[in-house]
């Protein structure tokens, strides 16, 4: 599997252009430390119409951080591609934490699916962004394809579970 994943990452390295490099660095930076997504969730919390969406995002991010970043990364301790092949010139700083699952992809899909479950149009735009964010992590040679796949699946599942729990709580409050 690692050979196939490296082959794909090396193919992505062959696509580099100055414009695409800048775009991927910028897109990836929006996922750094979850700041963009935290800000978006807080903004959504400010308005009654989007408050539930913002709360779902925050709960999903918290759960994802605990499961993905604190538990799974340290359980699997998967080396990053840039650690295994340091000959590839990186456009970003070498990450210090483990690779699996991708935290950027995890938070991107948690938030995108949280929005999509409540607003299909806005959610579709956020899903497109989440896919770009996931792609940027492979393009930048800091994640394997299975890292971003796991982040996308886990983030989507977490968002769906949080959404279902919030709906169930809301139903019980109305009884």
Question: Where do the protein language model's features map onto the residues?
Answer:
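N-terminal transmembrane-helix/juxtamembrane module of multi-pass inner/ER membrane proteins
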Residues: 1-35, 69-97, 173-175
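Small-polar-interrupted transmembrane alpha-helices in polytopic inner-membrane proteins
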Residues: 59-73, 124-137
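Interfacial segments of alpha-helical transmembrane regions
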Residues: 40-66
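Membrane-helix interface segments
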Residues: 19-20, 34, 49-54, 118-125
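Hydrophobic, aromatic-rich transmembrane alpha-helices
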Residues: 37-48, 108-114
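Membrane-embedded catalytic cores of phosphoryl/pyrophosphoryl-handling enzymes
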Residues: 89-175
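Membrane-water interface at transmembrane helix exits
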Residues: 44, 68, 72-77, 116, ...
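Alpha-helical transmembrane segments in multi-pass membrane proteins
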Residues: 56, 60-65, 69, 151, ...
């Amino acid at each position: 599997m690692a050979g196939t994943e490296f082959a794909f990452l090396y193919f992505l390295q062959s696509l580099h252009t100055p414009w695409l490099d800048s775009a991927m660095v910028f897109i990836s930076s929006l996922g750094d430390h979850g700041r963009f997504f935290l800000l978006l969730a807080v903004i959504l919390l400010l308005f009654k119409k989007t408050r539930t969406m913002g709360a779902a995002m925050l709960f999903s991010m918290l759960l994802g951080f605990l499961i993905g970043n604190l538990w799974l990364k340290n359980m699997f301790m998967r080396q990053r591609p840039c650690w295994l092949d340091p000959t590839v010139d990186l456009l970003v700083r070498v990450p210090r934490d483990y690779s699996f699952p991708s935290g950027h992809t995890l938070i991107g899909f948690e938030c995108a699916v949280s929005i999509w479950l409540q607003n299909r149009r806005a959610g579709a735009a956020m899903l497109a962004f989440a896919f770009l964010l996931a792609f940027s992590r492979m393009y930048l040679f800091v994640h394997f394809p299975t890292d971003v796949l796991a982040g996308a699946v886990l983030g989507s599942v977490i968002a769906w579970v949080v959404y279902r729990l919030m709906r169930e709580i809301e139903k019980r409050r109305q009884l």
